[in-house]
Design a protein with these regions (language model features):
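Short, basic/aromatic beta-hairpin or loop at an interaction surface
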Residues: 1-13
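Hydrophobic residues positioned within well-ordered beta-strands of beta-sheet architectures
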Residues: 4, 74, 94-96
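Short alpha-helix capping/helix-loop boundary micro-motifs
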Residues: 13-21
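Short, well-ordered loop/turn sites that connect or cap secondary structure elements
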Residues: 22-29
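Short, surface-exposed secondary-structure boundary micro-motifs
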Residues: 36-37
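Short, compositionally biased
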Residues: 41-87
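Short solvent-exposed strand/turn elements
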Residues: 79-80, 87-105
Length: 105
């Protein structure tokens, strides 16, 4: 299991996934976040969307606070990927620093 910490504008979100470490999002990958399923407090599962090779956040419960700057499907790009060691759980944590993608209409 890989622990992932998503850094969005300095706010950390924690994610569990069963993927191997080399399959976590890389720099330049697109991360798609549904505002109904993002939370600072709940662990959510990172799922891969096969059709476009993007990544979607999905939560089983709808008790997460909604962040105002998220839209229905907010796209973000991974700007930096680093690793740290979690001494409490004795495993590596992948930290993804992401930035919002803005499209002008």
């Amino acid at each position: 299991m890989v622990k992932i910490e998503l850094d969005i504008n300095g706010i950390s979100f924690f994610v569990n996934t069963t993927w191997k470490t080399d399959t976590v999002p890389a720099v330049g990958d697109i991360v798609i976040v549904d505002k109904e399923s993002i939370s600072q407090f709940d662990r959510v599962e990172l799922r891969k969307t096969p059709s476009n090779q993007a990544f979607r956040w999905a939560d089983e419960e709808d008790n997460a606070p909604v962040l105002e700057h998220f839209d229905f499907d907010t796209e973000m790009v991974v700007k930096k990927r680093t690793w740290k060691f979690d001494s409490e759980d004795e495993e590596m944590v992948c930290i993804l620093k992401v930035a919002f993608l803005c499209f002008e209409e």
